[in-house]
């Protein structure tokens, strides 16, 4: 037989083998899909029950259902790895196997997997049940929602905002710190066992595509694209930042630096994530009708159900389906009126088996009106890709899922749409001033959050990669916050805090870069859909409601789920394969032009050195080596604790003796910042149990003067080696080390020896005087002539004749 025949036969055998493998894989996946649907549903339902009723019983049921699902998935993942991907040509089968071959947390040992699950549950519970108490009324302890969020959204009281901001982080962040350290270690171990560099790399894997014809995309490319688009957005953000800073100076005179960063607790919510609630303070043309329709909603007696019904109408108007009957029956759209503890953070749920729900403690505000559109956008995506196999029921990437609802929010927020649904009066007319008002409100929500999102995820990526040691987490967090976002901490935070975890998404193990990518995608989608809807005019005035053509195009993309690369899905709608920030910049172009004119005489950018507490801070310099030489000790956390305690003691003494007040200052009331390795730092003092009540620097200086010697003695230093800059030295004597027992014994012994020597010397002198006196009377050796070589018998060589001590 010829060689070509054998080659053909081998190829046929190989093709048959591949065909057999592919058919077996299809059969395996069909069986998996059937079983996974039920087990996943039971796990999701138990999780829903826990999130809407936080009890020990429900967490136990959630853990049990989750364990069953995890065990099943682990087993199926191992089986999936027996099907070589190289032998699979059907892309739908191949993408399912690729997904299932990722083992997730099941690669961990049983003990570690259980510990990780315990940590995640604990972090979620701490976040959902944490409270902060009003220092002026300690019995008033508030949950985040409702309670603390109301303060952070509405209060203009600097100090009230500060105690709420700090109280949340001290109560929640500090509890989460040790858990988050374990979480990072375990998640990294899981990611590396799944062949990723670290957990951040694992998250970025959601964007990775192995495809042909230019549709491939790498994890490293995501980092490059995010950084590149951020440099393009930054000029717009810097001008928005400068404008907001000038307006905050009007509201909080003397509290804001005209060239510095913005205090983190003044930015509209608990995290400074969205600046939406700053609109009343920053509205450019206040005489114009208010485009925040919250008051109109209240006056028209809107409630949560009406809000979601209006959102549903919007989606239906573009040809997308109604919500299911089960959605309306099973969703939690308001906070329960009973005593149940719930997770209020808005989330959309695809439990499986056609069961779609939203969980949200809705309030009658324009912000929640837009949030309802966002969450319902998730549900529309879930319903659209329900036609896909179980493993492909997901967004093309995580950013796509977040973007869908935001597309609708862009249209729903326009004055034209608000007039259509009766929230703006029919007589409302748009002009250049109302246009700027509208765009500024949009920018506070959309542009203001981008650096926040970018910086948070950049910090987490660096933490997972090991580029920030845990001993420097908070130090680096606030360095990056100041440098990238232009936001400064209102009080310094040490390494006992975990400020990132005070945000829902961090405490609950969500990737966060999705909120950055979604913002880029949503404007790309909006521009494309507006073009399909035949919109004419500026992009920011486009309302795609009632455009069935736009809805049809969107639905085609939603139905794909994860069956195709996201690059292909993006191209299907917008005509390009990559993120492009140009539509976003085009949307805000009129505002950017206006902001540059407004900021013409203002400083644009921020000085990262300024701190809100700088005026009341005292700088300390410590010179251990020069003072103690080889006996110098190491300055560490324990020494800093002693310093803070010493200052607290000085404050107690001062208030007791000078002001006749008994105030229980403790070390936590002494706030240290700007610690340098050569031992210098700043500190200030707040009242006991009230971080917003800063003790005037002058009183702290008086307290230090009163107790200066005690403080010096605690560290074996003096005024020259323990310097409080700006406080005159007390001229107290240099430190005298305490006398120890062995020195006393040594002194006594040496004293006895010296006395003995003195006595011997005295007695020797007396004897010589007697001998000299005798020789002067008669010299027995006077006849000896030494010049003739005669020996003097009075000179003895023997040692025993010498006087000894």
From Swiss-Prot:
Zn(2+) binds at residues 374, 378, 402. Substrate binds at residues 273, 345-346, 515. A motif (PTB) lies at residues 792-795. Residues 18-740 are extracellular. The active site is at residues 375, 505. The modification Phosphoserine is found at residue 783. A motif (Endocytic sorting signal) lies at residues 781-784. Glycans are attached at residues 53, 90, 216, 299, 322, 546, 660, 690. A motif (LIR) lies at residues 778-786. Residues 614-805 form the Collectrin-like domain. The modification Phosphotyrosine is found at residue 781. Residues 697-716 are annotated as: Essential for cleavage by TMPRSS11D and TMPRSS2. A motif (SH2-binding) lies at residues 781-785. Residues 771-805 are annotated as: Disordered. PROSITE patterns: COLLECTRIN_LIKE, PEPTIDASE_M2, ZINC_PROTEASE. Proteolytic cleavage by ADAM17 generates a secreted form. Also cleaved by serine proteases: TMPRSS2, TMPRSS11D and HPN/TMPRSS1. Phosphorylated. Phosphorylation at Tyr-781 probably inhibits interaction with AP2M1 and enables interactions with proteins containing SH2 domains. It is a single-pass type I membrane protein. Residues 652-659 are annotated as: Essential for cleavage by ADAM17. Disulfide bonds join 133-141, 344-361, 530-542. It is found in: Cell membrane; Cytoplasm; Cell projection, Cilium; Apical cell membrane. It is an enzyme of class 3 (hydrolase). One of its GO terms (molecular function) is identical protein binding. Belongs to the peptidase M2 family. This is Angiotensin-converting enzyme 2. The gene is ACE2.
């Amino acid at each position: 037989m010829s060689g070509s025949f054998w080659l053909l036969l081998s190829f046929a055998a190989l093709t048959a083998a591949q065909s057999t493998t592919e058919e077996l894989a299809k059969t395996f996946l069909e069986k998996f899909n059937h079983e996974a649907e039920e087990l996943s549903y039971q796990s999701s339902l138990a999780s829903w029950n826990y999130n809407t009723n936080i009890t020990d019983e429900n967490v136990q049921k959630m853990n049990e259902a989750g364990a069953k699902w995890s065990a099943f998935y682990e087993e199926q993942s191992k089986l999936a790895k027996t099907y070589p991907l190289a032998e699979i040509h059907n892309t739908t089968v191949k993408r399912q196997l690729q997904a299932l071959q990722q083992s997730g947390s099941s690669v961990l040992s049983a003990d570690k997997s259980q510990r990780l699950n315990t940590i995640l549950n604990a972090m979620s519970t701490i976040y959902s049940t944490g409270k902060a108490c009003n220092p002026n009324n300690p019995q008033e302890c508030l949950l985040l929602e409702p309670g603390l969020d109301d303060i952070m959204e509405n209060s203009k009281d600097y100090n009230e905002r500060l105690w709420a901001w700090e109280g949340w982080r001290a109560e929640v962040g500090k509890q989460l710190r040790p858990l988050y350290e374990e979480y990072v270690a375990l998640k990294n171990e899981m990611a590396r066992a799944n062949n990723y560099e670290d957990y951040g790399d694992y998250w970025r894997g959601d964007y990775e595509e192995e495809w042909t014809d230019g549709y491939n995309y790498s994890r490293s490319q995501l980092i490059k694209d995010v950084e590149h688009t951020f440099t393009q957005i930054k000029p717009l953000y810097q001008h928005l930042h400068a404008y907001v800073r000038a307006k905050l100076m009007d509201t909080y005179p003397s509290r804001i630096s005209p060239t510095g960063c913005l205090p983190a607790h003044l930015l509209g919510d608990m995290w400074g994530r969205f600046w939406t609630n700053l609109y009343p303070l920053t509205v450019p043309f206040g005489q114009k009708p208010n485009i925040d329709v919250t008051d109109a909603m209240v006056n028209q007696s809107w409630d949560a159900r009406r809000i979601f019904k209006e959102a549903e109408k919007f989606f239906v108007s573009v040809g997308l389906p109604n919500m299911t009957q089960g959605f309306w029956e099973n969703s939690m759209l308001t906070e329960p009126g009973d005593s149940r503890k719930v997770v209020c953070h808005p989330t959309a749920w695809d439990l499986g088996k056609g069961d779609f729900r939203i969980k949200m403690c809705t309030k009658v505000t324009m912000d929640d009106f837009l949030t309802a559109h966002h969450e319902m956008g998730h549900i529309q995506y879930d319903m659209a890709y329900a036609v896909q196999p179980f493993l492909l029921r997901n967004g093309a990437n995580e950013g796509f899922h977040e973007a869908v609802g935001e597309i609708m929010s862009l249209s729903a927020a326009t004055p034209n749409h608000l007039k259509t649904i009766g929230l703006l009066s029919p007589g409302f007319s748009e002009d250049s001033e109302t246009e700027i008002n509208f765009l500024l409100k949009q920018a506070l929500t959309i542009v203001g959050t981008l650096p926040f999102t970018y910086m948070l995820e950049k910090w987490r990526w660096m933490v997972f990669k090991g580029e920030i040691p845990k001993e420097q987490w908070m130090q680096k967090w606030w360095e990056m916050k100041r440098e990238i976002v232009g936001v400064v901490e209102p009080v310094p935070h040490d390494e006992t805090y975990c400020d990132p975890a005070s945000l829902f998404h961090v405490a609950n193990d969500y990737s966060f870069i999705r909120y950055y990518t979604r913002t880029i995608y949503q404007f790309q989608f909006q521009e494309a859909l507006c073009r399909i809807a035949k919109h004419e005019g500026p992009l920011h005035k486009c309302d795609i409601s009632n455009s069935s053509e736009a809805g049809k195009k969107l639905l085609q993309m939603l139905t794909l789920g994860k069956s195709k690369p996201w690059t292909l899905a993006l191209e299907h709608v917008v005509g390009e394969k990559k993120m492009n920030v140009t539509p976003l910049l085009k949307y805000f172009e009129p505002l950017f032009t206006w902001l540059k004119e407004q900021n013409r005489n203002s400083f644009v950018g921020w000085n990262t050195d300024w701190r809100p507490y700088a005026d009341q801070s005292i700088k300390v310099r410590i010179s251990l080596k020069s003072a103690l030489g080889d006996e110098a000790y190491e300055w560490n956390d324990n020494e800093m604790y002693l310093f803070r305690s010493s200052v607290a003691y000085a404050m107690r003494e001062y208030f007791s003796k000078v002001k006749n007040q008994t105030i229980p200052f403790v070390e936590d009331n002494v706030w240290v910042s700007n610690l340098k390795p050569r031992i210098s730092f700043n500190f200030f003092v707040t009242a006991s149990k009230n971080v917003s009540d800063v003790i005037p620097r002058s009183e702290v200086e008086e307290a230090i003067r009163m107790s200066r010697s005690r403080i010096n003695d605690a560290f074996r230093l003096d005024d020259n080696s323990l310097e409080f800059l700006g406080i005159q030295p007390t001229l107290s004597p240099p430190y005298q080390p305490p006398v120890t027992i062995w020195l006393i014994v040594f002194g006594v012994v040496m004293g006895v020896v010296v006395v003995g020597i003195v006595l011997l010397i005295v007695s020797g002198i007396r004897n010589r005087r007697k001998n000299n006196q005798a020789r002067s009377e008669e010299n027995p050796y006077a006849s000896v002539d030494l010049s003739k070589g005669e020996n003097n018998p009075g000179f003895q060589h023997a040692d025993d004749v010498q006087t000894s001590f």
